[in-house]
Amino acid sequence: MRYEVLTQTLPDNFDWRKQKVVTEVKDQGKLDVSDVFAVVGAIESCWAIRTGNLNTLSEQQLVDCGRNETSANLREVFESVSSLGGLAPNSSYPYVAQHQQCKLNKTEISVRIEGHLKMHNEEAMARYLMAKGPFVVAFNGKDSLASYKGGIVNFNSTQCPPTKLSQAGLVVGFGVEAKMPFWILKNSRGGKWGENGYFRIARGSNTCGIASNVYSPFFDVDIGGPNIFVAM
């Protein structure tokens, strides 16, 4: 792989939903699998950006075949996608919100990834988002979203310790409201939760650990061109 320097000027607002490359908000139900939904969402969106094909992919495949139920282990979920050879469509392996025996037919896999990369810096995250697509984050969801109805989550590190990563989400955009920068995240609690299934959280100060555990997929179409980045 080669390195790409991302130096584009950041606008005040950017949202991949406007480009029709984000699938509808899903509902994980009773299972603690927000990391699975976030990773699948990132693969769906990033694949759509690269190919023009927005496919709804299977979370149930990862629940059944991928890894044990945990709270926010993003790297392990990406590794499961790679080891299984990719993801099947949701239509062939639909979500049922419970654990089953693995039923994966590998001939049905429709999207494969080459691997995943990790980010740290929120400036780099914003530049990457614009250049490459949505990515997944782990954060302290217990303290940040317990009573969320809308608005921008903006707690200090005492109110929402950044080391207690308990949930994952898909970052699809960013913006500024009343001089407060924020991230836009897709949750997996259905479209009636929060702001039509999404929530906003303060950007620039690692609020609730939002910049502590950040990953994105990359694909075979990225190989041969620059796909690891340095933000300036």
Q: What are these model-predicted stretches?
A:
Residues M1-M232:
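Catalytic-core signature of thiol
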